[in-house]
Amino acid sequence: MIDSNRKWSLIMKNTLHNLVKTELHCHLDGSLSFETIRELAEMANIALPESDSELAKLVTVPEDSETLLDYLKTFDFIRPLLQTQKALSLAAYDVAKQAAAEHVLYIEIRFAPELSMDKGLSAVQVVEAVEKGLQKAQRDFNIVAKVLICGMRQSSKQLTKEIFRQINQAKSLEFAGFDFAGNEHDFPPQEIADLIRFTQRLDRPMTFHAGECGCPSHIAQSIALGIKRLGHVTAIHDHPELIADFVENKVTAELCLTSNLQTKAAKSLAEFPYQELYEAGAKITINTDNRTVSNTNLTKEYQLFVDYFGTSLADFYHFNQNAIEASFASEAEKAELLAELKKAYGQTD
């Protein structure tokens, strides 16, 4: 006979799985299912271990990971698998399918086109392929899935500008906005400020990785540059004046709990800034960052917030509202998504 605590745990897990969710911070190359990784490897003639346990050692973060750079090394294995349009379309479809399976209503999937240009694809061809996969997923599942284009902070500024310019000018593309990822420690916002301003002049919305490497100054610099969505912001912990500035400027936080504990951006739950941001009234969203690399999904993340912080269903509803309002969807799409979210959570006026 199942004990009452175990029964309650199963009920809660099922409840969280069935909750309608949204996600703003999900990396394509870090979120491929094992099944799709195997399919892509076969297409690329790359040998893989037969067992999933051995494959996991190649594509999930090692337990002894100490830094963000250690964590990022895991992506090197996936890069050769994403060098054709067919592979990119399959990958995009796979990630959106995973999200839809746990009732994600809206997702923004981000990736760096330059990482899929090793075999001759142009930046525009890369984005076209990803969009094709997401369009198929939207037809097959009840999900809205959009593309975010990442620049790699450590790459040539000229290369990033050229890629962004080409993509922005391509009338065939429907991508939602821009982001900057990669080596934050050596390339803080001030170092790439001209690149950020260039991107802002393209008249597309943008988000930005900041505060993932223990540097609260990077969050302050990002806010000063006028960026209204920031990924991670982990280093804001124990900086009340910065939190106040964050709230005053109406910036939205893309929190990634599991990932931050793995990269040691937060060395413990006590250093993860959720509670401080929550109490200050900050705009919070919950995200996976990398489903496969971090061995997580949104249901697992929600469970952690319940277990660690006592997060309520009302909180989850509010965080999903935040995500839709801060999303790079159109105003018409936002209104429709908010109405669907409200209905799903049984909210009334």
Swiss-Prot record:
Residues given in the record as substrate binding sites: 27, 29, 182
GO MF terms, alphabetically ordered: 2'-deoxyadenosine deaminase activity; adenosine deaminase activity; zinc ion binding
Keyword Zinc: yes
SUPFAM superfamilies xref list: Metallo-dependent hydrolases (SSF51556)
Keywords, ordered alphabetically: Hydrolase, Metal-binding, Nucleotide metabolism, Zinc
Cofactor note: Binds 1 zinc ion per subunit.
Residues carrying the site annotation Important for catalytic activity: 232
Intrachain S-S bonds: none
Catalytic activity: adenosine + H2O + H(+) = inosine + NH4(+); 2'-deoxyadenosine + H2O + H(+) = 2'-deoxyinosine + NH4(+)
Highest rank taxon of the organism: Bacteria
Entry EC no(s): 3.5.4.4
Signal peptide stretch: none
One Gene Ontology biological process: purine ribonucleoside monophosphate biosynthetic process
Residues at which Zn(2+) binds: 25, 27, 209, 289
Membership in a protein family: Belongs to the metallo-dependent hydrolases superfamily. Adenosine and AMP deaminases family. Adenosine deaminase subfamily.
Function field: Catalyzes the hydrolytic deamination of adenosine and 2-deoxyadenosine.
Record protein name field: Adenosine deaminase
Taxonomy of the source species: Bacteria, Bacillati, Bacillota, Bacilli, Lactobacillales
